Amino acid sequence: GFFATAAAVVMAKGVPVFCDVDESLHMDPAKIEALITPRTVALAPTHVMGSVCNMHAIMEVARRHNLKVVEDCAQSCGGKVNGSYVGTFGDVGIFSISAYKIVGGGEGGLLITDDERLWDRANCLSEGGGLWRPERFAPPRYEGELFCGTNYRMSELEAAVDVVQLSKMPETVARFRTVKRQITGRLKTYREIRPQTMNDPDGEVGYTLRFFPETIELGQEIAKALKDAGIGAGIRGRNGRPDWHIYHDMYPITLKTKSGADDCSFHCPHYAAKGGKIEYRLGDCPVADDLFDRVVNVGLNQWYTEEDCVQFADVMNSVLSHFCTEDPSAKPWR
């Protein structure tokens, strides 16, 4: 995921707890329950780099423990899980429309929900605590409706741009999926490489191709060779620079800093009174630590032609065959 998801928890006066991942590089449903305490109020599965979480398993855990679910769909807008769009499983789905996302329209984002009370609260937060209502200055229509909100909202001009951009989303996602399938369908399999596990191969957006060489050093060599051959590949872990896409480098979180003037999140007396105390350490999420250091990320372009895809796959096969051993029985690309 990215730091922003955890930061949103702190801004809401909460304390984020990180869950480890599996080979899909998404929240591992099997590891959620061990992290749940009487203080847990919500799960925040994050759909990353065009792929999707195992939402059915996550929702089962949430229902069993009566927890809210907030889906962070910023990096996978248009993705699906078993035919249903990401963002429609949880209580709230959150999307980003910043310039470098799948659907870009400036800055900011949007949310969706089928809970009318949550929808009212979102509107109160974005427009003065209640000014959006038909009778702007009326008393509360029900207990708890009004609170001191803000004016966190995009401009009318940006909203108009975003409406048009969102209308293009299905075609954009379809192009990415076609490109990735044309490439992965031509890639050979290798003993020393495990492609990322896909929770829904047909539902992912498909703008990245990710795989795990068996060692960090092999990953570094492959990434460099791919770049030298003209393919946009890279690694994020063990490159000598901190990265706010991995929990232990999210310094505003790990250092337990404030959000705003007060100190009511990590150091809240109410949190402490309920037995709350958290420390963030390297090794808290060992699978994430391992995979993040080894994963090679390859970016794809929605405008690749079929000829481009053939050439792309040929170059990848050439590079991978130089470093790895072909093995038809190895894990296939998806």
Label each PLM-derived region with a short phrase.
Residues 130-140, 182-185, 223-295, 324-334:
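Conserved PLP cofactor-binding pocket of PLP-dependent enzymes
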Residues 20, 297-305:
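Proline-centric
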Residues 76-82, 89-208, 215, 242-243:
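Active-site region of PLP-dependent enzymes
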Residues 36, 59-68, 105, 110-130, ...:
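Basic phosphate/pyrophosphate-binding loop/patch that engages nucleotide-derived ligands
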Residues 44-46, 96, 196-197, 207-213, ...:
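Short beta-strand segments
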Residues 216-222, 305-311:
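Short, conserved charged micro-motifs
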Residues 1-73, 80:
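PLP-dependent aminotransferase-like
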